[in-house]
Amino acid sequence: LVLVNYLLFKGKWKVPFNPNDTFESEFYLDEKRSVKVPMMKIKEVTTPYVRDEELSCSVLELKYTGNASALFILPDQGKMQQVESSLQPETLKKWKDSLIPSIINDLRMPKFSISTDYSLEKEVLPELGIKKVFSQQADLSRITGTKDLYVSQVVHKAVLDVAETGTEATAATGVATVIRRQPRTLNFNQPFMVFITDMDSQSILFVAKITNPS
């Protein structure tokens, strides 16, 4: 018996990108290599932002219609490992609490789609104490009608698509004042991370590290 978990989240940006403005641009994998990707862009967008000088990264929040938001973390060139090693619940809370509505004069972000499959029966679930269901001693008769079945595999599939109108992922209404007005450009043309969260519960729905969006 194989159990499959497929979680679906569909979000539309509160402020969408215009597909007509998407263009081909370089995404730098490292200091020597780059790939061509479709790059979305939007000008003069007001959105929560903070610069973390201690960790050498920029943090941007884009909100969806409804109660979800995406937190994009853009480390400076060569600083990804430093940011990753510092990622703790306290770090995310600090960023969230420090976000200030800001005008981004030029925001550029690649379209990307990533997909990952996880097998949970070997390590994750047994570490949680779920073991018997994977052995011949399992009794699934109350849900299957037979005692001869046991679970051989548990698969979790996660898919994340980010495009102009919003996000498809498987696995306050506005800003009254703008505090930061100095010109600011954000170009996600190098590896970055994204956290999709539920704003009501502050639960993290999806986490992804984008190293090659092509």
Curated annotation (Swiss-Prot):
<dbReference type="InterPro" id="IPR023795">
    <property type="entry name" value="Serpin_CS"/>
</dbReference>
<dbReference type="InterPro" id="IPR042178">
    <property type="entry name" value="Serpin_sf_1"/>
</dbReference>
<comment type="similarity">
    <text>Belongs to the serpin family.</text>
</comment>
<dbReference type="Pfam" id="PF00079">
    <property type="entry name" value="Serpin"/>
</dbReference>
<protein>
    <recommendedName>
        <fullName>Serine protease inhibitor 2.1</fullName>
    </recommendedName>
</protein>
<dbReference type="GO" id="GO:0034097">
    <property type="term" value="P:response to cytokine"/>
</dbReference>
<dbReference type="InterPro" id="IPR042185">
    <property type="entry name" value="Serpin_sf_2"/>
</dbReference>
<dbReference type="InterPro" id="IPR023796">
    <property type="entry name" value="Serpin_dom"/>
</dbReference>
<keyword id="KW-0646">Protease inhibitor</keyword>
<keyword id="KW-0722">Serine protease inhibitor</keyword>
<dbReference type="GO" id="GO:0005615">
    <property type="term" value="C:extracellular space"/>
</dbReference>
<feature type="site" description="Reactive bond">
    <location>
        <begin position="180"/>
        <end position="181"/>
    </location>
</feature>
<dbReference type="InterPro" id="IPR036186">
    <property type="entry name" value="Serpin_sf"/>
</dbReference>
<dbReference type="GO" id="GO:0004867">
    <property type="term" value="F:serine-type endopeptidase inhibitor activity"/>
</dbReference>
<dbReference type="InterPro" id="IPR000215">
    <property type="entry name" value="Serpin_fam"/>
</dbReference>
